[in-house]
Amino acid sequence: MDKDFIISFAKLMSISGYEYCCEKEVDALVEGIFDESFKDSLGTRFFIKKCGRENAPKILVDAHLDEIGMVVTDIKENGFLTVTNIGGVDTRILQASDVIIYGKEKIFGVVGSTPPHLQSAEDTKKLKKIDELLIDTGYSKEALEKIVRIGTPVGFDDHYVELADGRIAGKSFDNKACAACAVDAIKNTPREELAGDVILMLSAREETGMLGNGASVGAYRIDPDYALIIDVNLGRTPDTPKTETVELGKGVSLTYCPVTSKKLTRMTAELADKNEIKWQISVSGRGTGTNTPDINLTREGIPCVDVGLPLKSMHTCSELLDLNDAQAASDLIRAFICSKEIAEVFAR
């Protein structure tokens, strides 16, 4: 899997509710791959690649495009900004972080941090709330107000680092790395090999799902025969529980839980084995923390398989993935959209 393609997606500014800001860039990244494209009023993008056969099954591949971020709540004296979070920002890592403020022009800022020399013993035990933090821009208030206003989105700085053994770290791999994997899979699949018409849904507002999820609206509009949802899954580290995480470098995860189709998941696992694609099991007694529950409950119910890309340090500015897992994700999506066996079972 091409790391530069993944990073090109991850660099896009698509904070929940502001997905429209990257429409032109997304169009450029998928140019020449799809037959049709359109969007809805929530900001979800749809891209269709047809198999060329009449009355073909509709296969939905969902990868949410939005990312966590912040939004300006006030402009203070001496060029400081206050913000609140959009989605589940990990406030533990915010102090001293580099950020980008997407105003009339893109400007940079740093989240302020009190030096340890000036902190009391009690201060060191406290975690500041996000609305207590200040972003330093270096501008005067007067100059800043010409560029930024209340309601301006703020995101993590878009720097990326390459680690050993094919691992990379940076912002917004949740979930734009998965979007890149889905595009890569569809791009590399000749239409005559498709088991049906494939609809890629780059859904909006997953990170703020309690406020209304773009996936449920989009799935209702498309009304697919069955669906594959790809999102990141919690990567295992020495300090995290084995039962709630998956390993990097061991391939994608397939989630068994009440809202996934057991038959579709089993057939997808068999497909992975047949194509020698690495995969691992993820189990939940509830939902998935992805778009799967929303899509599953759409209309009369849509059979879903939940595919996970292992990711460490989720919801931070340094999310970490393994490119081999990304390749496995792309390979499995390609095998899935080409599976005549799955189409025969789940086509309505």
Task: Indicate where each model-derived feature is located.
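N-terminal hydrophobic/helix-forming segments and targeting peptides
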Residues: 1-348
